[in-house]
Amino acid sequence: LAQSTRHPGQPLRVLIVADTFPPDINGASRFTERLAGGLVRNGNNVHIIAPATSKAWGTFTEIQDGVEMTVHRIRSYPLVIHKTLRFVNPLTLKNKVDLILDEFEPDAIHSQSHLSVGRVLARSGRERGIRLIATNHTMPENLLKYLHLPKFLEKRVKAKLWKDAGKVLSKYDQITTPTRRAAELLEAAAGIENVLAISCGIDATKFTNSTKTTNNPFRVLFLGRLDWEKHVHNLLKAAAKLPKEIDFFIEIAGDGSQKKYLADLARELKISTRVKFLGHISEEELPLAYERATVFAMPSIAELQSIATMEAMASGRPVIAANAMALPHLVHHGDNGYLFEPDDVDDFSACLLKVATADQKELNRLSENSIHLIQSHDIKRTLSIFEGLYRGDQDARQNSDDNSEDYMKPIGRLSIVVRRAELKVRRQALAALGKITDLGDEIKDGLEEIGQDVKRQAKKVDKQVRTGVKKTVGKAKKAIKRLDE
C-alpha cells in the first residue's frame, strides 16, 4: 500500500461502500454501521454509499450508531428472489460514483461487498489512485438457494461466483475477512492471496449486565435473518425433542423469507405456545433480549463470523452453534458452549439439554468463558487496524488478536495430559478412601468388642462396689451399736 500523505493522528477521509446498510438488519449491515460510527467518533470524516431502501434517494445526513454521517443513497429496486438484497442499475451507477469521488476526495475506499456498488468502486478508485480496502462478508452458497437452479448446475455456478469474487477483489490493495477460517476459504475458492483476518469487533460494554445466567425457566434466543442458510428450523426441531419436563421457551428475533414457514413448523411440532417471534428489535431492546436468555443458538451453516453470537458472548451467555464455517472460532466446545454437527437435530437437542440441566456453577463457568473469549474482539483494536490500512501503514497489515494461536487454546477444559493425571489422582484417592473405609469397619468392630468388654467390666465393678458398700454399711451398724452399749 502507498504511504498516506496524512500523518498518524490526522483525520482521515474514508468512503465506505456497501450493498446493505441500515435499516437493513444483518451482520454485514451492522458491522458497516458500527465501523462507520467508530471511525466518526475517532474524528474521521466518513461518507457511505449504499442502496436506498425507499423511494427517497440522494445525499442525506443520517444518525447511524449514535453519530451523524453523510450517506449517499443510490436508487435501487427490491429483488423478487431475496427479501433484503436490492438491485442498483449498473449503467448509471459509475457516473454517480465518480461524482461522489471527485467531490469527497477520500484517502481510502472500504468496500463491504463486491456484488454491486463495490464492483464499480474498484475500477473508479483505481483510476484515481485511491487506496482500496475490501472486506468480504459474502459466500456464494448463500445466494444459490435463491436462484432456484437445478442441482446439476449448482456446483458449476458456485465455482463461477467464486471466480467472479476473486476477479473483483483482486483489484483491491488489501482484502480482509472476519476470521482466519473465512480467509482460508476465500483464498482457496477465489484464488487470491494474503487475506487478513480482522474481527468485525464489538463494543462489549453495550451488552454488559449483572444478571446471572439461569435455566429456570430455560430460554433460548436466536437473532438474525430468517432465511434458509440460517437453519432456524433445526432449532425448533431440536427443542421439540427435549424431554417433557424441560420447561423451555424460544425467542426468535429478526425477519426474512422463512418466517411464515417457521411459524407453521412450530404449530406442526406442537410447540407454538413456547415460541415467540419478536420481529425486528431496536438497539435499546437488543441487550435486554440477550439478558433474558439462558443460551444463544446459532444453527447457521454459512457464518463468516456472526456478530449476533459475539453480542451474546458479550452479554455473558453460553452459545450453542453448528460446527460449520467460522462458528467454532467463537464457540469453543465445552468452554463457553457446545457445537453440534450441522443438520443433526438429535445432537443439537442433546446440546440444549446439557445447558437446560446444568447446575448454577456450570452455567456460571460457561458464561464467564464467553466474556473471556469476547475480550479479543474489542472493536477499538479493529478500528485501529483499519485506520492503519487506510493510511497505507505496512505495520497495520496484521490479523486481529482473536486470530492468534493462544485464542483457540481450551480455557474451561483440561488438556489430555492434565485430564489423565487428574483421573489418576482421583483413582488413587478412591482407593485410599476404600482402605480407610475398610479400616473404619475394623475400628468399628473393635470398638464394639471393647464396648462389650467395658459393659462386662462395669457390671463386675458395680457388683464389687455394691458388695463393698453392703459390707461397709454392716460394719458401720455394728460400730454404732457398740457405741450405744
Language-model segments: what does each one mean?
Residues 318-321:
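Short hydrophobic beta-strand element within catalytic cores of glycosyltransferases
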Residues 347, 361-376, 388:
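A short, well-ordered alpha-helix in the C-terminal region of glycosyltransferases
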Residues 333-334, 338-345, 354-360:
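Conserved acidic donor-binding segment of nucleotide-sugar-dependent glycosyltransferases
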Residues 301:
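Aromatic "clamp/platform" in nucleotide-sugar-dependent glycosyltransferases that forms part
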Residues 169, 280-281, 288-293:
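Short alpha-helical donor nucleotide-sugar binding micro-motif in glycosyltransferases
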Residues 213-239, 251:
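Conserved donor-binding/catalytic core segment of Leloir-type glycosyltransferases
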Residues 1-73, 411, 415-436, 440-443:
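N-terminal subdomain of nucleotide-sugar transferases
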Residues 52, 181, 201:
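Carbohydrate-associated surface elements
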